């Protein structure tokens, strides 16, 4: 059990004259309580199994330069991410993944927008050695249940992980 604290700083280009921006102009703060439970086998051994759970709460500063308004505020967003992971062979592991999100309603100039979000996603990941020091991780995730304003769809992600 541990405590997680993150600060997300504004990045990228932001213009209040544009309705969509790749950048951000507000800071957000995230607190979490990561938990990991594992069987007693050594970490790298085939058959090692673990359950990792990460509940987080993200707080957002106000956007004081939004498009078409004077101020946007965003309610905190609660999420829980969980992974059941099993080592299949040296350097190869697979996981079943779940993600739950709730909250994050936006208020524009003090008026609630009604876009509170809630939804579940499920998926799987597979990691395979790429080199002696690097792994490729393939992840698929699908929204399985949501409210009208919740995220929808699926994604496939590939990541190259090189520890140092």
At which residue positions do the language-model features occur?
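Outer membrane beta-barrel transmembrane domains
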Residues: 63-164
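Short loop/turn motifs that connect adjacent beta-strands in outer-membrane beta-barrel proteins
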Residues: 1, 40-49, 90-91, 132-133
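Transmembrane beta-strands of outer-membrane beta-barrel proteins
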Residues: 2-8, 50-58, 93-99, 137-141
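Short, flexible active-site loops
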Residues: 13-18, 32, 56-69, 76-81
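Beta-strand elements of well-folded, non-transmembrane domains
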Residues: 9-11, 35, 59, 164
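Hydrophobic alpha-helical segments and helix pairs
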Residues: 1-27
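Hydrophobic, aromatic-enriched interface-forming segments
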Residues: 23-65
